[in-house]
């Protein structure tokens, strides 16, 4: 298991970001990746989970986080980022898929933009209780993205889980990674 924690002050707001990853039993590499980018004003956090486990999943999630981090840092629009990732990931010979989930959190002061692709929806703890948040659904190359804009108060948290094996289901009941995703 690996845990990383980073605290940074952005625009008079303190962001505490912690990541816990755990390798699948018997695997030396983890299929989850997290990229953290900080500057004086903002933070960008990208989480990705590659299809499968071990080396294959690690390659997919590493490519996804690296490409998204680089493109977002260069202010590339999200639709172009998603298209580039989809066209670049190597195809799995067994499953005939090139697939990795991702969640992007971009902060600006006490506000944040949250973009989620095929991960369970993040849990937003607002004022000490699990809060509901709205999201718009956007389709980019048949990929369903959930985009939200959140406001954080002192003590608020955003918890992002990843999918777990083939048993995970999306909020609408479909299996993660089902055809068209």
What label would you give each PLM region?
Residues 30, 60-128, 140, 144-147:
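Catalytic core of PPM/PP2C metal-dependent serine/threonine phosphatase domains
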Residues 27-38, 132-165:
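Acidic loop->beta-strand submotif enriched in PP2C/PPM serine/threonine phosphatases
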Residues 122-135, 173:
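A short alpha->loop->secondary-structure connector
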Residues 10-15, 39-42, 107-112, 152-155:
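Beta-strand-turn-beta hairpins that frame and shape the catalytic cleft
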Residues 1-28:
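Regulatory cytosolic signal-relay segments
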Residues 180:
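Hard-cation-handling environments
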Residues 33-86, 155-157, 163-177:
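Primarily the active-site beta-strand->alpha-helix module of PP2C/PPM metal-dependent phosphatases
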């Amino acid at each position: 298991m690996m845990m990383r924690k980073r605290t940074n002050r952005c625009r008079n707001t303190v962001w505490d970001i912690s990541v816990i990853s755990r390798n699948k039993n018997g695997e030396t590499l983890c299929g989850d990746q997290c990229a953290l980018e900080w500057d004086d004003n903002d933070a960008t956090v990208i989480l990705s989970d590659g299809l499968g486990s071990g080396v294959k999943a690690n390659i997919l999630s590493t490519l996804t986080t690296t490409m998204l981090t680089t493109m977002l840092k260069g202010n590339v629009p999200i639709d172009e980022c998603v298209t580039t990732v989809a066209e670049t990931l190597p195809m799995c010979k067994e499953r005939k898929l090139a697939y990795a989930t991702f969640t992007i959190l971009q902060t600006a002061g006490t506000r944040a933009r949250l973009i989620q692709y095929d991960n369970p929806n993040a849990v937003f703890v607002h004022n000490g209780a699990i809060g509901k948040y709205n999201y718009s659904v956007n389709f980019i190359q048949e990929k369903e993205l959930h985009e939200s804009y959140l406001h954080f108060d002192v003590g608020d948290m955003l918890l992002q889980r990843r999918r777990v094996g083939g048993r995970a289901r999306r909020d609408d009941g479909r299996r993660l990674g089902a055809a068209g995703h």
